[in-house]
Amino acid sequence: MIIRGFFSALIALAVLVQPTSADETCMSPYMAKIVGQEDYVYIWTLGLEGVGDGEDKLVTVDVNPDSETYAQVIHSISMGGRHEAHHSGLTDDRRYLWASGLDTSKIFIFDVHTDPAAPKLHRTIADFVEKTGGVVGPHTNYALPGRMLITGLSNNRDHGGRTGMAEYTNGGDFITSVWMPTDDNLQGAEKSGSFADGYGYDARALPRRNVLVTSSFTGWNNYMMNLGKMMGDAEAMKRFGNTVVIWDLHSRKPKKILDVPGAPLEIRCAWGSRSNYCFTTTALTSKVWLIYEDETGEWQAKAVADIGDASKIPLPVDISISADDNHLWINTWNDGLTRLYDISDPFAPKQIMEEQIGEQVNMVSQSWDGERVYFTSSLLANWDKTSASEGNDLQYFKLYKWDGKSLTPEFNLDFVELGLGAPHQMRFGAHALYGGMTAQSPSGLITTPPAH
């Protein structure tokens, strides 16, 4: 249930947020990384009625400054309707991009290797709910060796927050599913505090520690509900997750359930070979949480920083950790700000800058070298703002240059003006991934993932 002190403030504000995942520094450790200049950004975009064809679509933008079509939309492919386009993720070989819909529970698999500039629909998974035994709302698409791990947000019995995860082959064949631990079925997990709610959201792996970490949000009944209606429903406002679960990565069995009250969302794990910790933020309480392994080998959760003025409900959404583990970008949707935290001491993060990005801001993705930072705006169809104050953008894809001190705008694409819709998840592509450029190309790779 939601912390009481924030309940009335949320009702009064009548805003809540559904955020998402990020970019090159936040991808699966099983993947090669683009460490030079990315060539393309693939943007999973929510269709808007009255905007273009009104359909969800995968939009490709050229982001290589040496290209003749730099800062332009060079390709888009529509999905035949609106599915509540939300998250996407690449397979470990980066040949396929998986993109899912939270409403229809369909998953679209795109071929991004044959022609990285023009992805093609390879396969559609339309029986996700049936195959998984009732999981609804495929959310995070996360690469494991030869497999994709898909987290759910809901179920087909009561469309609440209890849910599970599924595994597929890279080609889209179902393997297995597992449900989140609950009070009535802990599945052998240790309940360390007050909660075992069975909710799901994001997932990240630390293979060298044999650990998988999952977070929790809310179910279909809430994320597909009209925002105003939901905010006026006291029972609906109680249905948000308060847990992070530590899993045995190899067996996929839950080990420990941690209390992280207030809807813990994105999980971002440190890259250092001795850095056994991850960060998350709570949407309802505006806090940074550290999920860490202590000196005894036990996993713990600790609130380590505030995000803005919690009384004003800034609503933290997407986060992105730098490749050197020293900085964490945190977007807050309600005020349209991005904030940068110094996390060199993970137990004492400090905010060092903030910047207005738009009327609302959701996703943040950075290049591996940290020099380029991308932003998009959309949350959910029934939750997005419908107008912007003077001087602020509403639905956009933006690139900024980062020099270690300040953000400098590079370009801004208005997705409504372009007839595309509401931009959400971003993923990077590069010709060098598929042998399409020489070793001297500005696009580069880490061919073997770093220790993680």
Q: Can you say where each PLM-predicted feature lies in the sequence?
A:
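Short, conserved, GDST-rich strand-edge loop motifs in beta-rich repeat architectures
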Residues: I43-D53, T151-G161, S215-R239, T376-F397
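Beta-propeller domains
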Residues: T91, G193-R339
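Loop/turn-rich, solvent-exposed surfaces of beta-rich toroidal or solenoidal domains
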Residues: S311-E390
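Beta-strand-rich domains and repeat architectures in extracellular enzymes and scaffolds
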Residues: D23-V63, Y70-R95, A99
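Asp-box/WD-like beta-propeller blade repeats and closely related beta-sheet repeat scaffolds
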Residues: H113-L206
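Beta-rich, blade/repeat-based domains predominating
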Residues: T25-A32, D53, G80-D92, E130-L144, ...
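Short loop/turn segments immediately following beta-strands, especially the blade-tip
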Residues: V61-E68, I109-P119, T169-D173, L290-Q300, ...
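Blade-loop segments of beta-propeller domains
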Residues: Y70-T140
